[in-house]
């Protein structure tokens, strides 16, 4: 050590005297009387410098990439570090041509598809290739998601920890209208409209059952998987699913006659039945289940779907339980009340006190226009109605900065497009399909995003920031997917077949150059969300 220190100082092979008691007391003597003090002090300085340099060298052994992708020792909820090393992942369902597809992963923290060094050009879910992954049912808290592809009817389990396909959990008829998966994963439900079947995959019995319900096109299930409701297109009937006791009836016909069901399956020793639910309905198209598990809000589309009056029908969940076996002709009546919604309703979301309802209202000129209605859940009364994007509203979620986001499809056929065609240059003629609403005020001021307008007298044109492949300067197209990247002030969307990112601060759009996909973006999911409510 001493020789190495001396060599560093340039003293050749000169030896350094051993410490002695006099050296330890030298601080009390005049400097001129002790020339070795300079050597001792210099030696200490050099040793300190060497120690600092060696420490710095050790600490700098890691590359910059190590810090880019370094996870904390204790991850949130003990979640494993994924193979991609990305901490904030958004998964995108992409179809190349309708028959070949993929599930791509992008870095939602940096809004890039590659790693920082660009040594890995992209990330994706391994083992997945179904053609049209149009529906992602995401459960980040459970470290998985389910992807339904309408090209082959497959419902695939995606393992978020390994970023790989865990295989198909079942196959519904291709082109099914809707699927429903509860977070218990005990059943999977599929509404197969073309076949007129409501298919139930029961993981508790390893059985699959198909209930004959002509034109069934929607199915909804609550969080506990105790209530499953089915809806029929162009109908005012709502069905619930219930399970018979083991060997309760010998035949299908006996079960139908005893319970008043529309169908029971299988034909011998039936297990499941579907029965109509008493209540007031007008083209029911969806169900929102209350946060406390007591109420089911049935969304009646009304005139938007060829009926008469849009409304919400409130039902008690207790009588709808799948273990409640009805007796014909008397059925348990779960209805609480029916609340008309003048603005229309096809999508709903609650914060615990207010139910936000998105839909369309028929206008005197025969066109529809979009509205957001608010309902006080304590009094079951409509308290407000606000203009939003036109189209069929099916996406709604909360996000950062106390915002609410609403997405719709086929927005270029409503009142806003008519205003645009008439030369209106205000936001009233913005016919895009995404609306941002800032909550918390006495009144709400929704804004359609991106904000665009055509040129007028003294008004310059404002076009979409990042046009899609069709290069339409004012319209992105239908919004088919949206997810909230929690705590990062952004939402990701599948908007007109491409990925677009919006700020929850002001609704502005982030650059999508490095997350844009080759093919058609169909749906998105935030894989690392803190809760399941971010998707």
Identify the function of each model-found stretch:
Residues 203-349:
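Solenoidal tandem-repeat scaffolds enriched in leucines and small polar residues
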Residues 2, 21-22, 28-35, 53-92:
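Bacterial Sec-dependent N-terminal signal peptides
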Residues 493-535:
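Blade-level signature of beta-propeller repeat domains, shared across WD40, Kelch, NHL, RCC1
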Residues 109-110, 159-163, 202-205, 243-246, ...:
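Short loop/turn segments that connect beta-strands within beta-propeller blades
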Residues 73-81, 130-140, 173-185, 214-225, ...:
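Repeated scaffold domains used in trafficking and secretory/extracellular systems
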Residues 98-107, 153-158, 196-200, 236-243, ...:
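Structural motif
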Residues 92, 147, 190, 230, ...:
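Residue position within the beta-strands of beta-propeller blades
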Residues 65-67, 114-128, 164-170, 205-211, ...:
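A short beta-strand motif characteristic of beta-propeller blades
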């Amino acid at each position: 050590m001493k020789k190495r220190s001396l060599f560093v100082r340039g003293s050749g092979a000169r030896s350094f005297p051993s410490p002695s008691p006099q050296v330890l007391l030298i601080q009390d003597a005049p400097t001129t009387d002790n020339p070795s003090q300079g050597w001792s002090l210099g030696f200490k300085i050099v040793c300190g410098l060497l120690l600092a340099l060696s420490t710095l060298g050790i600490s700098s052994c890691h590359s910059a990439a190590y810090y880019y992708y370094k996870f904390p020792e204790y991850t949130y909820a003990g979640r494993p570090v994924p193979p991609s090393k990305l901490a904030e992942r958004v998964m995108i369902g992409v179809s190349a041509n309708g028959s070949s597809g993929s599930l791509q992963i992008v870095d939602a923290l940096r809004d890039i598809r590659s790693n920082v060094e660009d040594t890995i050009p992209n990330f994706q879910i391994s083992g997945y290739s179904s053609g049209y992954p149009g529906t992602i049912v995401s459960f980040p808290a459970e470290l998985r998601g389910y992807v339904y592809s309408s090209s082959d009817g497959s419902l695939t389990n995606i393992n978020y920890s390994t970023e790989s396909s865990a295989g198909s959990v079942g196959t519904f008829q291709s082109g099914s209208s809707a699927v429903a998966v509860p977070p218990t994963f005990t059943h999977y439900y599929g509404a197969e409209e073309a076949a007129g079947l409501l298919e139930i995959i029961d993981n508790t019995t390893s059985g699959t059952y198909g209930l004959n319900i002509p034109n069934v096109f929607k199915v909804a299930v609550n969080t506990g998987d105790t209530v499953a409701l089915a809806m029929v297109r162009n109908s005012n009937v709502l069905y619930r699913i219930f399970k018979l006791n083991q060997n309760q009836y010998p035949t299908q016909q006996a079960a139908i006659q005893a319970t008043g069901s529309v169908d029971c399956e299988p034909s011998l020793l039936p297990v499941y039945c579907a029965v109509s639910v008493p209540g007031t309905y007008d083209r029911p198209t969806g169900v929102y289940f209350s946060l406390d598990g007591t109420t089911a809000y049935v969304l009646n589309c009304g005139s938007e779907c060829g009926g008469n009056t849009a409304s919400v029908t409130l039902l008690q969940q207790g009588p709808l339980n799948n273990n409640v076996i009805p007796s014909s002709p008397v059925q348990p009546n779960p209805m609480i009340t029916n609340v008309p919604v003048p603005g229309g309703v096809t999508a709903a979301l609650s914060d615990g006190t207010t139910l936000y309802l998105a839909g369309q209202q028929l206008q005197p000129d025969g066109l529809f226009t979009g509205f957001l209605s608010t309902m006080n859940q304590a009094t079951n009364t409509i308290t407000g109605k606000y203009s939003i994007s036109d189209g069929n509203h099916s996406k709604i979620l909360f996000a950062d900065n106390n915002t609410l986001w609403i997405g719709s499809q086929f927005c270029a056929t409503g009142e806003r497009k008519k205003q645009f065609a008439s030369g209106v240059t205000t936001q009233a003629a913005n016919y895009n399909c995404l609306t941002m609403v800032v909550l918390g005020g006495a009144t709400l001021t929704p804004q359609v995003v991106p904000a665009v307008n055509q040129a007028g007298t003294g008004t310059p044109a404002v076009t979409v920031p990042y046009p899609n492949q069709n290069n339409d300067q004012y319209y992105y197209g239908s919004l088919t997917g949206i997810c909230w990247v929690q705590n990062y002030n952004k939402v990701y969307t599948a908007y007109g077949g491409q990925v677009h990112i919006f700020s929850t601060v002001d609704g502005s759009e982030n650059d999508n150059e490095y997350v844009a996909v080759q093919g058609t973006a169909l749906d998105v999911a935030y894989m690392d969300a803190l809760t399941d409510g971010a998707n």
